[in-house]
């Protein structure tokens, strides 16, 4: 079971802010679209997708004994124009550094998208997820079809 708590902090004239605490004791600050003291909830959903797939991919690559020396993920999303503004399209770009077999990366991303990443499984219900990767410095870049 996953647990969490939200506490609302209000300051006169300064907007609204929630301090969220996970069941494991980690805290983060959320703010609304008008505030600048924390992430918006929709941003956290996108970051959760990136974190979910990143952990999957890096763990799979390590099990395949790939020499990953650096890893970044860049995410962009389009949202529905009317409320609720759910994601309609998400672009995920994986950038990996090291001596890495492109087939291993392709397989790791595929497993994340089709088996392991629960956040991706939820977001894919409303959004088309498009994934690319590149291995640097070799510069191998490939576009992957949506796994769903």
List each language-model region with its residue ranges:
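Extended beta-strand/beta-hairpin segments
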Residues: 1-47, 58-148
